[in-house]
Structure formats: C-alpha cells, structure tokens
Amino acid sequence: MYVCVRTDLGLGVGLKPTHGRVPFTGISSGDAMTDHAGPLARTTLEAATCLDVISGYDGIDDRALGGSKPGSTRFAAALQQDHNQLDGFKVGIVVEGFDHSAVDPYVKGAVMTAVQKFKELGATIEEVSLPEHLHGPAIWTIQQRIAGAQTLLGQNTGRRGLYMTEMEHARLPWTDDGFQRAFPSTKNVIINGLYLMQRFPGLYGKTANTGRFVSDKYEALFEKYDILVMPTTPVVAPRHGKRELPLDSLRPSMGLTINTAVFNVTGHPALSIPVGFAPAKEDNQVMLPVGMQIVGGLWQEEKILRAGHAWEAHFDWKTMHYSIDKN
C-alpha cells in the first residue's frame, strides 16, 4: 500500500474529509477555518484504509473536537463488504461545476461520460443547479489572503493546539531579502491580505457568514441526493517548469480551484478519482488524467467512498481517452 497525507486534493485518488475529521496537528496552517488534511492514494480502498488510521480527535487540535474517537471508523471494512452496486443511490450533477467558462470541453466531456456510468451501477442521475457554488472561490480567496497573511506574519491566534514555533522562528522576522526570495504566491498572500485588512475591516467575518450560508444550501441538497459530482479541476495538469515573471508563475494555477475551493469553505467531504484522459493544453498529442469530484454531506465519507469504489471496480479509467470527435 502506498499512501500519503496531503492538504486539499491532488492527482491520483485524493480524499478531503469533513473539516475536523482528521487533526491538523503538525501541519502548517493557512486558515484554521478551511484547513483540511486527507489521504492521497492509488485506490479508493487505500484512501479509506488511511482515513481509518488518521481520523479522530488527537487531544491536541481543536478543529477535531467534533470528530470521532480514534480507531472507531470502519470505512475500509465497509468497502470490502460492499457488493459494488449503487442501487437506490441518487447522484446530482452540479451544472455550475460543468458549465463554468473555465472548464475545458474535453474535461467536461470526460467527466460527464464517467458520471453516466453510475447508471450502470443502479444509481439515478439528475442535473441540479446551485448558483451559490460559484461564490466559493471568492469566499475562499478572501479568507486565505487575510488569514494567510496573519499566519505568515506570525499573528494567528485563538486556537487550542500545537503551534509550529520552530517554523515561525525560521521564518520570522521577515526581511527584505527573505521576502524577495519567497515564492510569488506567498508574496501575493501577504500583500493582498494586508491590503484587505486595511481597506475592508470586517470583511473576513462577512465571508465566514457567507460560507455558512453556502454550506447550508449544500446540506439542503444532500437531503435529496447521496452524492454530487463535477470535474475536480477545470483543465488537466498544466506544464510544469520555472517561469521568469511572477505573474507567469501564478498563471497556471489560476482558476484551478473553481470546483474545490467551495468545499474548503463549507467543510464538506470530497473524493477525487481519475476517470480517463484528455489532451494537454500545450500539446494535444499528450494525454493527461482527468479527475471526477464526488462530494458528500457533512460526515458522510462512507457514501463518497462507496461511490468511488464502485466506479473503480467496474470501469478502467486508464483505457478511457476522451475525444470530442468521437462523442
């Protein structure tokens, strides 16, 4: 078994648990309200096995005060006993997650093709609209800039937990030389965070309240649907490499979180599984993996794991090369 613990989502099978299910102890915080840590693995079963191990309040991190008792979850065992069918499952296709202008047509097609395969497993599929989904990136960006700047400047307070004092000692105080050597995204957080705090006092609280509103909207949907689906990222992975200008360094990541940032805000669990290939933007002869994001209600990891595991059991994503001409 090959697994690692990551923050947010990445390539492979990535699982972002409900906020607070996994303690954040020992991980550098961006914003305690949106901090999530979870497994990155080769399969859904491996991710579930890792989640069983790392879940539960550790007696240190107050984010996890509402979590389960360590060692009490049985996500992996439930998958191993499952018959890999989804009879009675209701799947909602979030149209805002597919129809955003940033979503590449190849990615949209590949994920929509994968979603339709849930029908073969016994699930019913419906389109659902949630306009508030589109507010997620703006809410998350503001929170990350303000809270991130406070953290980077050593001004984060108000948590019961383990503070990373060794890291703070190495980073602080900021000097001009240290700031110039920082990655452009770090400079972006500090400059924009300070600007927002100075020009828009009280803005962080407004975004926090708006985030609760969006979370409630999603919870209402989960009274009707077992899972919601959409592309994980709007495009396949951009070309990696050093870029000369700061803006060029930031540009490849712009817009990548249009479907993921909102669930950092709301705290809902989300699973990303690979469902095929689509051509790279820089070279359409290069085919790169496409991820489908499966989202569940708060503390409903079992449902998203079950859906991901069933899809994996019946379909081989490595053979699925999406072509607009053929679909």
Question: Over which residues does each language-model region extend?
Answer:
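Short glycine/serine-rich loop segments
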Residues: 1-57, 265-275, 288-291
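Short amphipathic alpha-helices in soluble, non-transmembrane regions
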Residues: 307-308
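Short, well-ordered beta-strand elements within core beta-sheets of diverse protein domains
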Residues: 35-42, 192-198, 293-296
